[in-house]
Curated annotation (Swiss-Prot):
Species whose genome carries this gene: Synechococcus sp. (strain WH7803)
EC number(s) reported in the record: 7.1.1.-
Subcellular location: Cellular thylakoid membrane
Transmembrane segments: 13-33, 51-71
Function: NDH-1 shuttles electrons from an unknown electron donor, via FMN and iron-sulfur (Fe-S) centers, to quinones in the respiratory and/or the photosynthetic chain. The immediate electron acceptor for the enzyme in this species is believed to be plastoquinone. Couples the redox reaction to proton translocation, and thus conserves the redox energy in a proton gradient. Cyanobacterial NDH-1 also plays a role in inorganic carbon-concentration.
UniProt-listed InterPro entries: NADH-quinone_OxRdatse_su_L
Name of the protein described by the UniProt record: NAD(P)H-quinone oxidoreductase subunit L
Catalytic activity: a plastoquinone + NADH + (n+1) H(+)(in) = a plastoquinol + NAD(+) + n H(+)(out); a plastoquinone + NADPH + (n+1) H(+)(in) = a plastoquinol + NADP(+) + n H(+)(out)
Length: 81
């Protein structure tokens, strides 16, 4: 394994790392932040903030759809009898 990493140029490893970091931000970090933001501010958002959030949801949809089965965004108090 050591010789394999030495055979790959340093610039190539940096490019692979940069792609990995951008992919992680696009698919994990920003979508989780959007879920958190929408959950905290859903009932108090203004028109422009909601429009901006809708645009970000459209932009980061692939990452959001990855977490959709695991997150529950129902408002508190829903389902009480």
């Amino acid at each position: 394994m050591e010789t394999l990493l030495n055979a790959i140029p340093q610039e190539t490893l940096l490019v692979i790392g940069a792609y990995g970091a951008l992919g992680a931000a696009y698919l994990v970090v920003i979508p989780l932040f959007l879920y958190f933001w929408m959950n905290r501010r859903w009932t108090v958002m203004g028109k422009l903030e909601r429009l901006g959030i809708y645009g970000l949801v459209f932009l980061f949809f692939p990452g959001l759809i990855l977490f959709a089965p695991f997150l529950n965004l129902r408002m508190s108090g829903q389902g009480d009898v």
